[in-house]
């Protein structure tokens, strides 16, 4: 069984249970669809017969977390067909097939989401920084990057669930707590949280990962960058969301943001020897 099939099969019972409770609790019209990952990239014009080797055969696997999804929306199905988890997996795969280009994320296409600061500044910047460092040390090796969200459910407006409706978060905890299974199946070597600091996102990280310790990186304040020792992955870091423009009452400009990024990118570089796929 290929990895993408394992991932899809894992989602199915969780999603079915989640939908039952979202409907019974009167929440289904308040939320965007649960955020599911998929590995198939388009092949012969179809993601259904797509290729997952871009990820499975990568030497370095990086997962980048945002806060919660915006601009996602429920897929439109024909003939009143009931929405299934595979439809949401395919929605992710179509988005990735249209915008992911191995060494950069397309930000001038038709998707409004791909033009967001998360992809334009954060995702693209980190892809470029990691690929540049990897090429210098291991010129024959290749990295793959997956987008994820630490909040698998968000309101229709895409805002924090803590502000809008804590019942939605409880539904995720009770019926769609899938991030640990995603990590177990996908086995990322590096996890980067572009979630910022404080509630509710620090709590969401703690709900999904076992944090052994935290430490500073270089000379950067732990209010801006934190290295996380996680039980689940070799390397993990947390910093501000790319859309953040003010921190502790002062502006966060591009130069400061790149000081933060370069600090943990250099730390990743210094720890490439911890990555099994690079040895």
Task: Give, region by region, the residue ranges found by the protein language model.
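C-terminal capping/extension of enzyme domains
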Residues: 1-13, 163-180, 199-279
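A polyanion-binding, active-site-adjacent surface
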Residues: 2-186, 190, 196
